[in-house]
Amino acid sequence: VLSGQSRVRFGDESAQTSIMGVAENYSEVTDLKLTEGSFFTESNVTNRSSVVVLGPELAERLTGRQTELIGTTVHINNYPFRVVGIAEAKGGNQFSSPDMDAYIPITAMQLRVQRQSVPNAVDFLLIQAQDSQSIDLAMQEAKTILRASHRLSTRQPDDFTMTNQEDVLSIANSITNILTIFLAGIAAISLLV
């Protein structure tokens, strides 16, 4: 996945939003469902096709509707992209929402949206294990592949980080606990005052 911010335009309407450069299997790995159209194909990625799947809120903001948009053209970073799908609403929070995202082939992202000094660079990889017992093995295999592709010797430390959903949940729980203690402290001070 390669992510960035860019302006998406349809006619006179535009929105600054997250652009996600992804592979053709992203929708399967993340369980991203579509209400209309289809996700792009391996051929679209290979050919650096200018195709896009819009989040429903982004589609609504740009066009005033979430349907009948397949085949229309939006501009991302002033390049035309043909709409091939509309994602199903997932909801979000006040800070971010996948419903405002646009998904394009990672190769189109590298070529047209985020020209990079390091070719084929990515921000992060999403890897899905076959089952919960395979997670550690999948992470070890991914680590081996990344170390080899980064040409790291056995004495060199990793130049990347790896996390799994357990790690993310643990961090979220720690933050929640800290906030709970902080709010309890504020409440106690308020009662004293």
Regions found by a protein language model. Name each.
Residues E13, M20, E24-F40, R48-S153:
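Mid-to-C-terminal secondary-structure elements
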Residues L126, S134-I135, A142, S153-G185, ...:
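Peri-transmembrane interface segments
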Residues G4-Q5, L58-A59, D167-V168:
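Alpha-helix capping/helix-boundary segments
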Residues S6-F10, G91-F95, S170-A172:
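A short acidic, helix-capping loop that chelates divalent metal ions and anchors anionic groups
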Residues L192:
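Glycine-rich active-site/cofactor-binding loop and its immediate structural neighborhood
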Residues V1-Q5, A121:
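Membrane-proximal extracellular/periplasmic loop immediately following the first transmembrane helix
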